[in-house]
Amino acid sequence: GKLLKTIDTHALGDRPRGIKASPDGKHYVVSLEYGDKILLLNSKFKALKTVATAKGPYGIAYDKSGKRLLVAAFKSKELQVFNGKTLKLEKTVPIGDRCWHFTFTPDEKNLLIACGRSHEVLVLDGTTFETVGHVKDLNLPWGIVAYPKAMGSLDFAK
């Protein structure tokens, strides 16, 4: 691909870890690990605002509807669920150690979270975000994608 723009995030928070377009294409969200923030950009990549997160935001993704924005805050061992439009925090869910990336299943019935230092993939209900299962004894799982493509921190389906 072609480089569209370089954005200096140093004043806002360093170490961008994830970027996702909103399903409607009007915004981008960026997780800033060394600022414990989400950076909201417009479609021309202008910074609009930052929103505080738990410690260590990493994986970031919207659900298909754009109503929810999820952030895996690995240092806090939390999954944060934000309102996809207002970016107000709606729910915090305890998760495992070093949970970096996640994906919804294609039907969005479940959310799968790769938890590296817990050596497992957590299976959460896709609506309540309660833990419904575990895939254990894995060797440092870092990322996860679903097939057919789904909404997640490493994949994007429309």
Residue ranges and their predicted role:
Residues G1-K158:
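Predominantly soluble domains enriched in secretory-pathway, periplasmic, or organellar proteins
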